[in-house]
Curated annotation (Swiss-Prot):
Keywords: Crown gall tumor, Membrane, Plasmid, Transmembrane, Transmembrane helix. The gene is virB3. The chain crosses the membrane at residues 22-42. NCBIfam families: PRK13854.1. This is Protein virB3. It is found in: Membrane. VirB proteins are suggested to act at the bacterial surface and there play an important role in directing T-DNA transfer to plant cells. One of its GO terms (biological process) is protein secretion by the type IV secretion system.
Length: 108
C-alpha cells in the first residue's frame, strides 16, 4: 500500500488548442469562411477591412484564455439555441429553476 504515484509533467502546449496567427483554428476557419461569404455577397473586397478588428479582438480574448473561443462556441451550441428560455427556463447546469415564477411552476 506504500506505492508511490508517478509524476508526469504536463506541458502548457499540450493543453492549448492549435493557433493560426494567434487565433484558434476553429475560430480562424469561421472568420475565413465569413470573409468568403462577404466577398461573394457584397462583391467588394474593401468590406474585408471589417474583419481585421474582429481578428484582433479574437486575439485579445484568446490571450487571456486559450479556450475562450471553444467556450463561446459551446454556449452557442447549447444555451444559444434555446429560444424559448424564458418559458422553459433555458439551459442550466442545475436541475432546479434559478428563479421561481410568481405563479408557481407548472400551474396555469
Amino acid at each position: 500500500m506504500n506505492d508511490r504515484l508517478e509524476e508526469a509533467t504536463l506541458y502548457l502546449a499540450a493543453t492549448r488548442p492549435a493557433l493560426f496567427l494567434g487565433v484558434p483554428l476553429t475560430l480562424a476557419g469561421l472568420l475565413v469562411m465569413f470573409a468568403g461569404f462577404v466577398i461573394v455577397i457584397v462583391q467588394n473586397p474593401l468590406y474585408e477591412v471589417v474583419l481585421v478588428p474582429l481578428w484582433f479582438g479574437a486575439r485579445l480574448v484568446v490571450e487571456r484564455d486559450y479556450n475562450a473561443a471553444s467556450v463561446v462556441l459551446l454556449f452557442l451550441q447549447t444555451a444559444g439555441r434555446s429560444v424559448d428560455g424564458l418559458i422553459w427556463g433555458g439551459a442550466s447546469v442545475s436541475p432546479n429553476p434559478i428563479k421561481v415564477p410568481a405563479r408557481g411552476r407548472g400551474m396555469a
